[in-house]
Amino acid sequence: MSDLTHLDETGKARMVDVGAKDETLREAVVRGEVHMRPETLQRLAAGDMPKGDALATARIAGIMAAKRAPDLIPLCHPLLLTHVAVDVRLDAATSTVQIEATVRTVGKTGVEMEALTAVSVAALTVYDMCKAIDRTMQIGAIRLVRKSGGRSGEIVCE
């Protein structure tokens, strides 16, 4: 269990002490998608949704969610985020809403959880705003694409 930093010597969950770590520029990029019927995607593109501008709302929801990650995820460190961007685009070929979040900070721990939270909540927001016309939607493929900073250096997952 020694390689699991969120567990103490007895196996109990704990918040990792990052006090001795150096402050470095940290960045994480996460992607995810919402699959939907082509008709739903067309209505999104046309801005014809019963609840309003779903894509703009999803972007803002994702940004807000990144800032609230420590309130949602136990033992997640509160961080001073220096940048949060959420990009939401439509892919007609796959009938998906593609979501990408980039989060940065200068700090002692990474920002993957904040980026994962941003994409997750943006996807949930798209779902919520489209569910009245499409109950077949699926949220999926939420994954870390890249992270950098700290002892691990750069990690590229795709």
From Swiss-Prot:
Coiled coil: none annotated. Pathway: Cofactor biosynthesis; molybdopterin biosynthesis. It catalyses: (8S)-3',8-cyclo-7,8-dihydroguanosine 5'-triphosphate = cyclic pyranopterin phosphate + diphosphate. Pfam families: MoaC (PF01967). It comes from Roseiflexus castenholzii (strain DSM 13941 / HLO8). Catalyzes the conversion of (8S)-3',8-cyclo-7,8-dihydroguanosine 5'-triphosphate to cyclic pyranopterin monophosphate (cPMP). GO terms for biological process: Mo-molybdopterin cofactor biosynthetic process. It is an enzyme of class 4 (lyase). Disulfide bonds: none annotated. InterPro entries: MoaC, MoaC_bact/euk, MoaC_sf, MoCo_biosynth_MoaA/MoaC, Mopterin_CF_biosynth-C_dom. Gene3D superfamilies: Molybdopterin cofactor biosynthesis C (MoaC) domain (3.30.70.640). PANTHER family: CYCLIC PYRANOPTERIN MONOPHOSPHATE SYNTHASE, MOLYBDOPTERIN COFACTOR SYNTHESIS PROTEIN A. GO terms for molecular function: cyclic pyranopterin monophosphate synthase activity. This is Cyclic pyranopterin monophosphate synthase.
